[in-house]
Curated annotation (Swiss-Prot):
GO biological process: protein refolding; response to heat
InterPro entries referenced in this protein's UniProt entry, alphabetically: A-crystallin/Hsp20_dom, Alpha-crystallin/sHSP_animal, HSP20-like_chaperone
GO molecular function: unfolded protein binding
GO CC terms of this entry: cytoplasm; nucleus
Domain called sHSP: residue spans: 38-149
Annotated region (Disordered), positions in chain: 140-166
Superkingdom, natural source: Eukaryota
Family: Belongs to the small heat shock protein (HSP20) family.
UniProt keyword list: Stress response
Organism: Onchocerca volvulus
UniProt xrefs under Pfam families: HSP20 (PF00011)
Name listed for the protein in its UniProt record: Small heat shock protein OV25-2
Keyword Ion transport part of the UniProt annotation: no
């Protein structure tokens, strides 16, 4: 399985070295491209996938390295905030410790209804946060009743009423 960056570099180098020499392509690739540590981190998916459709907004993120109690989802103004935090732990080999913390923020589109935001964590560790959207500028329509106001007195009646008050 190759990452998008690796495919880009391979395509770029293929077009540059179009003579198809016998020199292996990986020998000219950056050193970090084949390091297993980076592939294990799954960098591409950890950033999340945004789904912005006409009637729905959703975000999916791989948070499989975190327990549900180590995650939080909140909305601050028009910003969706996902946080995860591991407390410092000693690694199993006893050579050191590890602590992980991330904060990922997404600006919510104007048409997202904040009160419809829901989050679900799958058994595979994929966090999905979704919300309904409404069309911008549309409001619920309603009829406004026309009520009869009390009859106003005529001009000569107004002066008689004013004289009586004085």
């Amino acid at each position: 399985q190759t990452s998008p960056m690796e495919r880009f570099i391979v395509n770029l180098l293929d077009s540059t070295f179009d003579d198809r020499s016998s020199r292996p392509l990986h020998s000219v690739a950056p050193y970090w491209l084949h390091q297993p540590e980076l592939n294990e981190c799954n960098i591409g998916n950890s950033l999340g996938e945004v789904i912005n459709e006409k009637d729905k907004f959703a975000v999916r993120a791989d948070v499989s390295h975190f327990h549900p109690k180590e995650l939080s989802v909140s909305v601050r103004d028009r910003e969706l905030v996902i946080e995860g935090h591991h407390e410092e732990r000693t690694d199993p080999a006893g050579h050191g410790s590890i602590e992980r913390h991330f904060i990922r923020k997404y600006v919510l589109p104007e048409e997202v209804q904040p009160d419809t935001i829901e989050s679900h964590l799958s058994d595979k560790g994929v966090l999905t946060i979704s919300a309904n959207k409404t069309a911008i500028g549309t409001t619920a329509s309603r009829n406004i009743p026309i009520r009869a106001s009390p009859k106003e007195p005529e001009a000569n009646q107004k002066s008689a009423i004013n004289d009586a008050k004085q």
